[in-house]
């Protein structure tokens, strides 16, 4: 209303907030609950990491990293063992399922936002500990799944399981999300198998009252359909793909896809030298009406002979960038479209084997004028 730019608006809001805070410091502060709960902090770490990544706000990402490092130093009392809370310099009470699961999820979010492998390593440690500490190995209708507390805890007459959502997502749902994420980001098949076992153990309850299990159902979709958003993982975590769209003043746009591969891995070029190889290819998904691709610039491939193949191969094995020119259709009506679905087909190979072909659907944020 006053003709302010977005940056000017935020500066003005920050100034108002600072003035209010300075005024508030002149009055007695209310008492504060100083407990640092591991599960709740794990949720906040996820939120900060995702917000910092999506909004390009380094303050949020830095706060998530500080919180994660503090928890790792204070509530992780031994490898694979975390406490429920931290208070007055002490880590107290054995961690519950939700503590391991939510903190692990926060560490995965930090790995996604930064690409730093130590966050993924920490998340794997918690996921492995979660399964060994809370899994119900009993067979039968009531067996399987995860207990809320330690399997070795005999202080209760029964061992409850946290499956349905309440004010927060259930510990089981958080564990499912963690395992599904690690199944995409690592080459360890056990994570996917454990995630499927969780779904199977809860299937009877979910079928009876699905409305009580929204987080679990979202986790099931994540496990079966893969990730959503502009960042995806393929080749058992060996390939990391990120996409973005740069709008142009003309109404057209440029789609940029960056592909990073772990050492020892490659994907076939867009035009392989052999007809039987699966090419790397980009196209718009079927539910992206109103746009078409005018042209795609694929990177120049390397032509190499590898140990498992006598013939030369045209491949991408380092950081590779694909750029596509997007042009709107004349009668396009969704000018405020928020996401553009883009398909990337590829087949990844290591030193001794090739994995099955994969098709990823990247939901790329996009606002056009």
Protein language model regions, located:
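Extracellular/lumen-exposed scaffold segments
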Residues: 192-193, 206-369
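Glycan-recognition and catalytic cores of secretory/periplasmic carbohydrate-active enzymes
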Residues: 1-243, 249-258
């Amino acid at each position: 209303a006053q003709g302010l730019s977005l940056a000017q608006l935020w500066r003005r809001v920050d100034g108002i907030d600072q003035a209010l805070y300075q005024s508030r410091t002149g009055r007695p502060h209310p008492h504060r609950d100083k407990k640092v709960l591991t599960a709740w902090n794990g949720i906040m770490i996820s939120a900060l990491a995702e917000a910092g990544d999506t909004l390009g706000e380094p303050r949020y990402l830095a706060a998530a990293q500080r919180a994660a490092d503090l928890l790792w130093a204070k509530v992780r009392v031994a490898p694979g063992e975390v406490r429920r809370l931290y208070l007055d310099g002490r880590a107290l009470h054995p961690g519950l399922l939700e503590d391991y699961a939510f903190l692990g999820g926060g560490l995965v979010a930090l790995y996604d936002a930064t690409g730093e492998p130590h966050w993924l390593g920490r998340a794997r440690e918690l996921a492995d500990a979660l399964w060994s500490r809370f899994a119900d190995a009993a067979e039968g209708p009531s067996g399987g799944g995860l207990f809320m507390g330690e399997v070795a805890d005999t202080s209760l007459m029964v061992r409850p399981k946290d499956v349905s959502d309440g004010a927060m997502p259930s510990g089981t749902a958080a564990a499912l999300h963690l395992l599904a994420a690690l199944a995409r980001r690592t080459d360890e098949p056990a994570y996917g198998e454990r995630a499927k076992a969780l779904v199977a153990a809860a299937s009877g309850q979910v079928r009876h009252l699905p409305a009580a299990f929204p987080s679990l159902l979202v986790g099931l979709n994540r496990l079966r359909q893969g990730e959503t958003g502009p960042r995806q993982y393929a080749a058992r975590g060996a390939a990391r793909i990120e996409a973005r769209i740069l709008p142009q003043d003309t109404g057209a746009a440029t789609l940029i896809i960056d592909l990073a591969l772990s050492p020892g891995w490659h994907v076939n070029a867009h035009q392989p030298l052999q007809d039987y190889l699966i090419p790397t290819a980009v196209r718009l998904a079927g539910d992206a009406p109103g746009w078409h691709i005018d042209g795609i610039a694929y990177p120049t491939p390397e032509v190499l002979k590898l140990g498992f193949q006598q013939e030369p191969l045209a491949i991408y094995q380092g950081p590779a960038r694909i750029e596509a020119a997007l042009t709107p259709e004349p009668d396009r009506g969704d000018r405020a479209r928020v996401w553009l679905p883009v398909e990337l087909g590829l087949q990844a190979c290591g030193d001794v084997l090739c994995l099955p072909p994969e098709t990823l659907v990247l939901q790329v944020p996009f606002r056009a004028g």
